[in-house]
Curated annotation (Swiss-Prot):
Its cofactor is a divalent metal cation. The gene is ispF. The record marks 49, 148 as: Transition state stabilizer. Gene3D superfamilies: 2-C-methyl-D-erythritol 2,4-cyclodiphosphate synthase. GO terms for molecular function: 2-C-methyl-D-erythritol 2,4-cyclodiphosphate synthase activity; metal ion binding. A divalent metal cation binds at residues 23, 25, 57. Homotrimer. Its EC number is 4.6.1.12. PROSITE patterns: ISPF. This is 2-C-methyl-D-erythritol 2,4-cyclodiphosphate synthase. Transmembrane segments: none annotated. It comes from Nitrosospira multiformis (strain ATCC 25196 / NCIMB 11849 / C 71).
Length: 177
């Protein structure tokens, strides 16, 4: 059978979808550093309209992308005063609600924070717990890693922090077994 002859229902086996997200923000003085919903002691914070949580923003984009719902800017514009300094956990919870309204749930999240400093390892368990809670998942279905940029580029020079995320979603009536 040629691909053109396959019906749409046959193409979407199991109803699984993959999403990918990315975010980057500049480090500046005078702001607190919030990553994964965790306030991290550091002399600089991330610049942005919201709390500039790069990790949660990347996850929001991954989840929205998997559901073909655009990106974080489409739903939470950085020109809308309602989102000024908003806790990005609220945004992630809202993204989870949008997903559920369309009959999907997140199966797993895998994310990477890229920062020359500060060290993230001791904060990762709290980040994982926040993400799992906000997306109504088990912590064992969330993975967060931290890497340096090996002193290369703007992130390596300590000018900013990046995050990347991928996720798998499925219809709530589907099982992953």
């Amino acid at each position: 059978m040629f691909f053109a002859e396959i019906k749409q229902e046959e193409v979407i086996v199991g109803g699984f979808r993959i999403g990918q997200g990315f975010d980057v923000h500049q480090l500046v003085e005078g702001r607190k550093l919030v990553i994964g919903g965790v306030t991290i002691p550091y002399e600089k914070g991330l610049l942005g309209h919201s709390d500039a949580d790069v990790l949660l923003h990347a996850i929001c984009d991954a989840v929205l992308g998997a559901a073909a719902l655009g990106d974080i800017g489409r739903h939470f514009s950085d020109t809308d005063p309602r989102y000024r300094n908003i806790d990005s956990r609220v945004l992630l919870q809202n993204v989870g609600n949008l997903l559920a309204e369309r009959g999907y749930r997140v199966v797993n999240v895998d994310a990477t924070i890229i920062a020359q400093a500060p060290r993230m390892a001791s904060h990762i368990p709290a980040m994982v717990a926040n993400i799992a809670q906000d997306l109504r998942m088990q912590p064992g279905d969330v993975n967060v890693k931290a890497k340096t940029a090996e002193r290369l580029g703007p992130v390596g020079r300590g000018e900013g922090i990046e995050a990347e995320a991928v996720c798998l979603i499925t219809h709530m009536n589907q099982t992953t077994d």
